[in-house]
UniProtKB/Swiss-Prot annotation:
Chief localization: membrane
Phylogenetic placement of the source organism: Bacteria, Pseudomonadati, Pseudomonadota, Gammaproteobacteria, Vibrionales
Protein name: Multidrug resistance protein NorM
Subcellular location: Cell inner membrane
GO molecular function: antiporter activity; xenobiotic transmembrane transporter activity
InterPro entries registered for this protein in UniProt: MATE_fam, MATE_MdtK, MdtK-like
Single biological process term from Gene Ontology: response to antibiotic
Pfam family, one: MatE
Keyword Transmembrane helix in record: yes
UniProt KW Amino-acid biosynthesis keyword: no
Database matches in PANTHER family: FMN_FAD EXPORTER YEEO-RELATED, MULTIDRUG RESISTANCE PROTEIN NORM-RELATED
Amino acid sequence: MHRYKKEASNLIKLATPVLIASVAQTGMGFVDTIMAGGVSAIDMAAVSIAASIWLPSILFGVGLLMALVPVVAQLNGAGRQHKIPFEVHQGLILALLVSVPIIAVLFQTQFIIRFMDVEEAMATKTVGYMHAVIFAVPAYLLFQALRSFTDGMSLTKPAMVIGFIGLLLNIPLNWIFVYGKFGAPELGGVGCGVATAIVYWIMLLLLLFYIVTSKRLAHVKVFETFHKPQPKELIRLFRLGFPVAAALFFEVTLFAVVALLVAPLGSTVVAAHQVALNFSSLVFMFPMSIGAAVSIRVGHKLGEQDTKGAAIAANVGLMTGLATACITALLTVLFREQIALLYTENQVVVALAMQLLLFAAIYQCMDAVQVVAAGSLRGYKDMTAIFHRTFISYWVLGLPTGYILGMTNWLTEQPLGAKGFWLGFIIGLSAAALMLGQRLYWLQKQSDDVQLHLAAK
């Protein structure tokens, strides 16, 4: 019992800064929306559309670089800190290489917008925002590579502090470039992209400064010697991170596809769906931060050759995540009207949003289990299992079921509309929770040699 209590304490210490850093990240998007909305509805819509293209693209790169966290955590746990600089340098090189195709995709935004049938003024602003935010791509991914290093060393506070500095800088920079202050051009929504690019370069430099000057990282000597690109290691990191990157990409695009499918149901339904989805994404930060912390703890314990400790870390993470989700789900049910009223005063939208928030409460519990189980499996470097199971859950089970229930009368007398899609979310996430949980259980039942061999790849 003592080990469980100690592990819970370690987990919370790691997860709390990750949670706060996520809040800061979300806050930057919120500031962009508010500032652009202060110019016009077109500017706000343009920023929103641009974000729907930017986010899946950049998260693919982030997913690739998340592979570095368990690699560093295991080397640190094993006492082989001398090998960490090589891995970090390969991660930084991978970040630069991945930036190229992501920039190429984002640079073609005008062709993507053409398929979306967006009005000309909005399309022009969307493309302008994207061409500005393109400059943030290498900084964002290099920052993620360095953050994977510090997180892997169980130092999650630096990214938290720098994330909040980024948020504080984002506000005045948005004000300057959106509204044209201090001699800067008045760029409207495009100015949000300029501010974002500047902020991420500053955040990268701040994290680099911390790593170079930190006494807690001095023994690693991460930049004492430059390690040249090693194709074999770059391919290994890419193969390790690709399943996570693909899983993240498919998860984000799933919600984007559902938003498009819900659109023909009318503005009231779309608004209610967005209320429930936006609130759920905010609550998701809790289990997501626990999943990130579990990945670090499991990787560290496996580096120490402590498979029992890794299992305890995973199990404590699952219990903590589920307990947190049960609390947030209960609060969602009890205060669903007040939550809906935070977003809108339209009573028709509020009434439907209240119904969808009941589905969101169930969704939160399933989501917590699957994201923490996935975090545990990342610690074991069992990345491919995550991809296969989440792809089947979301795209083979969740989305088709949601479409059948929401848009057809094949299983019900009348199409259920948005409720059908939320039932699809619940079915998909429940399947993911069961399959990822089963995989984790199976892995923990294997011999120490099998577990350590998998973690060593």
